[in-house]
Amino acid sequence: MKILLSCLRFSPVWRGPRSAACVMQGGKLQRFQSYNTAEEGIEEDIQFAATNQESSSLLYPDHIPTNAVQKLLLSAGSAVMALYDPYRHDMVAVLGETTGAVALRKLRDQMRRDPEGLQILQERPRISTSTLDMQALREMQDGTLGREYARFLDVNRVTPDTRMPVKFVDDEELAYVAQRYREVHDLMHTLLGMPTNMLGEVVVKWFEAVQTGLPMCILGAAFGPLRLNNKRMQKLGVLVPWAVQSGRNARCVLNFHYENRWEQSVLSLRKEIGILPLPEIKA
């Protein structure tokens, strides 16, 4: 039996270097070894990639074809690491791709039924530093989507380029839907008024879980609060019901061509989408 999987070592731009070794012989996993030093504070990598794929079977540039068994292994490994460290965006990304086929099809169908969503599927816009004029966004009027999005990125020291390309979705159109969801995630933070700390991420995940039905979002919403202290849990008790109600009330957030709405005010866009006013929270 041929080797099914081998480890890939990734060093995302937002993470330091890691190393891991995975050996499969005779179709069986012989050893998984990771190296983690307390001084460096590095978490072990369990990124996998399919081997022996034919170039003719690739559906898009970053595609890595996988079978059901490989997807199961990827899902299990990435779920463990994502729960251990929710800031492992690479693990969260793999988990979303390997478990989200049903949800992605539903999202794709919602986009097809909406004029603006259909336009997005046809035009395939991308959100990255190569497609955005960040300086122009920074110079927009306060309160506009463009200005507040740029402010969010600057304050939290992130860029649109930190979103990994989709690899494990075995359908070209669904892969774009997954990529679009990933690239508008920071816009959800902006529209919901949530920072990138653990509290903010959990609140956004509750909103996205209701909106998308992606297992990865549901998992993050359910287990993310375990890492919050008592004070933040009290705030979460107010914010989660609001996020859930907003998610149910809102139109599909993938049906908005945000690149054409930079000059629209955040307040008016929130109303158009159906996001409820942010509740007051005691300090």
From Swiss-Prot:
<feature type="binding site">
    <location>
        <position position="186"/>
    </location>
    <ligand>
        <name>Zn(2+)</name>
    </ligand>
</feature>
<dbReference type="GO" id="GO:0005739">
    <property type="term" value="C:mitochondrion"/>
</dbReference>
<keyword id="KW-0496">Mitochondrion</keyword>
<dbReference type="InterPro" id="IPR027540">
    <property type="entry name" value="Coq4_euk"/>
</dbReference>
<feature type="binding site">
    <location>
        <position position="201"/>
    </location>
    <ligand>
        <name>Zn(2+)</name>
    </ligand>
</feature>
<keyword id="KW-0862">Zinc</keyword>
<dbReference type="GO" id="GO:0120539">
    <property type="term" value="F:4-hydroxy-3-methoxy-5-polyprenylbenzoate decarboxylase activity"/>
</dbReference>
<keyword id="KW-0456">Lyase</keyword>
<dbReference type="GO" id="GO:0031314">
    <property type="term" value="C:extrinsic component of mitochondrial inner membrane"/>
</dbReference>
<keyword id="KW-0831">Ubiquinone biosynthesis</keyword>
<protein>
    <recommendedName>
        <fullName>Ubiquinone biosynthesis protein COQ4 homolog, mitochondrial</fullName>
        <ecNumber>4.1.1.130</ecNumber>
    </recommendedName>
</protein>
<keyword id="KW-0472">Membrane</keyword>
<dbReference type="InterPro" id="IPR007715">
    <property type="entry name" value="Coq4"/>
</dbReference>
<comment type="pathway">
    <text>Cofactor biosynthesis; ubiquinone biosynthesis.</text>
</comment>
<keyword id="KW-0479">Metal-binding</keyword>
<dbReference type="GO" id="GO:0006744">
    <property type="term" value="P:ubiquinone biosynthetic process"/>
</dbReference>
<feature type="binding site">
    <location>
        <position position="185"/>
    </location>
    <ligand>
        <name>Zn(2+)</name>
    </ligand>
</feature>
<comment type="similarity">
    <text>Belongs to the COQ4 family.</text>
</comment>
<comment type="subunit">
    <text>Component of a multi-subunit COQ enzyme complex, composed of at least coq3, coq4, coq5, coq6, coq7 and coq9.</text>
</comment>
<feature type="binding site">
    <location>
        <position position="189"/>
    </location>
    <ligand>
        <name>Zn(2+)</name>
    </ligand>
</feature>
<comment type="function">
    <text>Lyase that catalyzes the C1-decarboxylation of 4-hydroxy-3-methoxy-5-(all-trans-polyprenyl)benzoic acid into 2-methoxy-6-(all-trans-polyprenyl)phenol during ubiquinone biosynthesis.</text>
</comment>
<keyword id="KW-0999">Mitochondrion inner membrane</keyword>
<dbReference type="Pfam" id="PF05019">
    <property type="entry name" value="Coq4"/>
</dbReference>
